[in-house]
Amino acid sequence: MDALIRIFASATEVEQDESCARIVGLNMEGPFLDPAKKGAHVEEYIRKPDIEFFRECQNASGGRIKVVTVAPNMEGAEEFIETFKDDVVISIGHTGADYDCAAKAMEKGAHHVTHLYNAMNPLGHRAPGVIAAAADDPLCMVEMIGDGIHIHPAVVRNTFRMFGEERIVLIS
C-alpha cells in the first residue's frame, strides 16, 4: 500500500508545478471494497476499511481526497463512515451489501453511490439492495455510467424517473 501513499503524495507534487492544472479533488475508489464485487480492481490491493490508512492517504494528498468508496458490508465500514462522514463524501460501491446494510450505512452518513448498478447486486423484488436503499434516502446522490454500454438506455431513463435529475451524477 506504500504505492497508494506515493500516488496520493504525487498530487501535491504535481500541483506545485505551475504549468500543471489545479487539482480540485481526488476520488478514492478503492481499496475498501468487497472482493466479491471488485470489478477491475486488483484483489491483492483490496482491504477492509482502515481509518489510520485513510488518514495516511489523506495526509499524503494534502487533504485532496474528497470522495472515498466503501463497501458497507465489510468489517470496519460502519466505524469508518462515522469517523469520516463530515470530512469527505462517503460513497457506497463495489459491494454485496443488502438493503438493510446499505440503509444503515446511509443513516450513518454515506450519502453517495459509486456507479449505480455496476459492481453491486441487482435491484430485486425480494432483495432490493443498494439501489432501493439509495432511492429511499432523499440525501443520496448516485453516479451512473451513461455510455449506453454499462447500463441499458431504458434503465438510465427509469433511473432518472426514480431519482430525479438533481440526484444523479453522470460519469465516464
What annotation goes with each model-predicted range?
Residues 1-128:
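Histidine/acidic-residue-rich, glycine-tolerant segments that coordinate divalent metal ions
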Residues 101-172:
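Active-site-adjacent C-terminal substructures of enzyme catalytic domains
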